[in-house]
A protein has these predicted regions:
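Conserved post-Walker A coupling segment in P-loop NTPases
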Residues: 11, 18, 24-93, 101-117, ...
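AAA+/SF3 P-loop NTPase mechanochemical coupling elements
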Residues: 95-105, 117-123, 136-153, 165-166, ...
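Nucleotide-binding/hydrolysis machinery
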Residues: 2-20, 57-62, 137-147, 155-301
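Protein kinase-like catalytic domain
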Residues: 30, 117, 128-129, 240-243
């Protein structure tokens, strides 16, 4: 399948086989009404694929709503998704439609679906199975006709095994699985993306675009990119503002690549967790803290191994349950 028109329409940069396969799979499943689960690391560019799916579906003239499940507090997520009746909780001064009601006839994209509370997962499963939902504070079931597309950076089978994600919901969402490859598996795309981001920054800051020496190109390609495309974009943005010399060499690049020595690996190295240094894992989560705070909290939960900790000894992020 020729995916070039799709990439041009949605501004998707790259030509790696893994990326083209993901786009092709999305385009093929778009005309159906099947649920789709998009899996990939944080920052790998999952967010554009639901837009492609909606645009090439029979629902393209209906609403498209994207919801970041990890950014909504647990106490209000049911209200956000399914709506509420007046007086159903403190502050509910009037009835309000939820996203599933607003998206009727269209597509709803549930990003970070792995962060949904178990109680909300039960409600979502009902929507997928019957097309029905109940507003918070109501006993009346309402119908909705939406297509659900979900995305996650969580290893879902592990989440199912741990009991943090319902097995029946996982298989209901995973009717058509789509895998978005991380940037380290798209080596042929790295320089293309660098040039694209450099041109963007040049136009924004009215300065010549950054270029790379050949050695710097090789370093960029060999780097593991734990923060994926988001990290590369931020790196180009920083250098575009700070660096006076527009040709970036290895010495300059090294200043912007954290832990280069642990990030540079042979091309034949495995991609398993055992091949990533502890420092790099910490960086991966801290780097995306603002958008992936729930992933950081999950790491803390793993560290305490499910054992209760006194609030005073908990890390501040875990203790305060921040939502950004």
């Amino acid at each position: 399948m020729n995916v070039q028109p799709i990439k041009q329409r949605f501004g998707i940069i790259g030509s790696s086989p893994g990326l083209d396969r993901a786009i092709s799979n999305v385009a093929q499943v778009a005309p159906t009404d099947l649920s789709v689960l998009i899996q990939g690391e944080s920052g790998s560019g999952k967010e554009v694929l639901p837009q492609v799916l909606h645009a090439y579906s029979a629902r393209k003239h209906g609403p498209y709503i994207a919801v970041n499940c990890g950014a909504i507090p647990e106490g209000t997520i049911d209200s956000e998704l399914f709506g509420h009746e007046k007086g159903s909780f403190t502050g509910a001064h009037e009835a309000r439609k939820g996203y599933f009601e607003v998206a009727n006839g269209g597509t709803i994209f549930l990003d970070e679906v792995g962060e949904l509370p178990l109680t909300t997962q039960v409600r979502l499963l009902r929507v997928l199975e019957t097309g029905e939902f109940i507003r918070v504070g109501s006993s009346k079931a309402q119908k909705t006709n939406v297509r659900v597309v979900a995305a996650t950076n969580v290893q879902m089978l592990q989440a199912v095994a741990k009991g943090t994600f319902r097995e029946d919901l996982y298989y209901r969402l995973n009717t058509v699985p789509i895998h978005v490859p991380p940037l380290r598996e798209r080596k042929e795309d790295i320089h293309l993306l660098f040039r694209f981001f450099a041109q963007e920054a040049a136009a924004r800051y009215k300065a010549p675009p950054l270029t790379l020496t050949e050695e710097a190109q090789r370093m960029l390609i060999a780097y593991r990119w734990p923060g994926n495309i988001r990290q590369l974009r931020n790196l180009v943005e920083q250098m575009s503002v700070i660096e006076q010399t527009r040709e970036v060499d290895v010495k300059t690049l090294r200043d912007y690549l954290p832990e280069e020595s642990t990030a540079l690996v042979p091309a034949s190295a495995g991609g398993g967790i055992e091949s990533i240094s502890e420092r790099e894992l910490i960086y991966k989560f801290l780097y995306d803290m603002k958008s992936d705070l729930n992933a950081l909290k999950e790491q803390v939960r793993s560290l305490v191994a499910g054992q209760p900790m006194p609030a005073a000894t908990m890390p501040p992020v875990y203790r305060e349950e921040l939502y950004i």
